[in-house]
Amino acid sequence: MDPTVRRNTTRRLPTALVLTTALLATGCSGRADDGPEPAATESSATPHGYVEGAREAAEEQSRLLLGDPGTGASRVLDLVTGKVHETAPVTGAAGLSTDGRFGFFHTDRGAHVVDGGAWMVDHGDHVHYYRAAIRDVGDLPAGRDAEIRSDVGVTAVTDRVGRTTLYDRTALEEGEVGPARTLAGVHAGAVVPYGEHLVALSGDDDSAEVTVYDREGSPVASPDATCERPRGDAVTRRGVVLGCADGALLVSAEDGVFTAERIPYGQDVPEKERATAFRHRAGSDTLTAPAGRRAVWVLDVTDRAWTRVRTGPVLAANTAGEGSPLLVLETDGALHGYDIATGRHTARTEPLLTGAGKAATGAGAPVVEVDRSRAYVNDRTGRRVYEIDYNDDLRVARSFGLDIAPGLMAETGR
């Protein structure tokens, strides 16, 4: 059944006006993509952007990967068709990450890989959007604390002690986990594929040096830069952002030459208020991260500037980038909007989280996912996902009822 959309005509949405739809239509893992096709581009014998086994679409094909930490049940919610697809259960899943196409359910036994069947390819001056079958791929041998990062060519899995294993991402696209290669050495934090290379931090957690490898794992000329007590990373159009004790380090490449630029906080920041868990919209150069309990850091990578926005008690935060509000899910269960430049509180929803005061933290905590026009919030206890129009005073655009408790959520199609 298709979800029903009802527009909110007031600044704050009464919950009685949210019309929800039970979306219990399920599929099976590896099934062919179903439902009405989105608008597709014209094709030819070998058209530009052609990908075998996929359909090219004219717009973003967003899907939500969902997991129930209690039962291990997993689902994929297609935000274009409104259908829910059932995927293989993942018992003991304690976390969920994504590279924009694949979801990685983290367990003590390894990381279970699900192909969300939606992704984009950014050529700089234009973008291609694709959709394909949703399917379970297999398991990567990694612990629940493993950091997984990908680009179009390679997936890097770094374990908790800094050992990194490399996988051919094209094998994942073909539905299997291919042979693995081990990257020499031990690294502080995740190894990040970027610019057809691998960006890493070599050394211990107190002070690590930027090291760049080629795809075969051989060191290449690296910028002379260090990062003290590294925690957190993100890939933007401007380069790789690495979280350091004094702010961030931006590692970028031009014509195969890598450079590093420091972006300091500009003030003394206590350890517990550092930016260590970055969130952002794919393709955006504006990052967010909690700044302690009652504030959020916003890093404008383009302007090389940090802004600290005071908020209520933070559960999760994100933003779509320049011109969009800072979105903060607070412990009152409501999503709040803030003007990044002024810090002014601009909007809020009614409480979205069932039993807001008891919302989980850490593994299974709610998140805020953001794409080009909407934000998504998962209500684990209420078995629901909310779609928010952040350009319309945080209007609740849709509400998806589910047959699982979606404590884990990540968006693909980006």
Predicted regions and their residues:
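Bacterial signal peptide processing site
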Residues: 29-32
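Short beta-strand elements that form the blades of beta-propeller/WD-repeat-like
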Residues: 56-69, 95-114, 145-166, 189-205, ...
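Repeated scaffold domains used in trafficking and secretory/extracellular systems
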Residues: 45-57, 89-102, 131-152, 181-196, ...
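A short beta-strand motif characteristic of beta-propeller blades
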Residues: 80-89, 122-140, 173-183, 217-225, ...
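C-terminal motif of bacterial Sec signal peptides marking the signal peptidase cleavage site
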Residues: 24-27
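Intrinsically disordered, low-complexity segments enriched in Gly and acidic/Ser/Thr residues
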Residues: 295-380
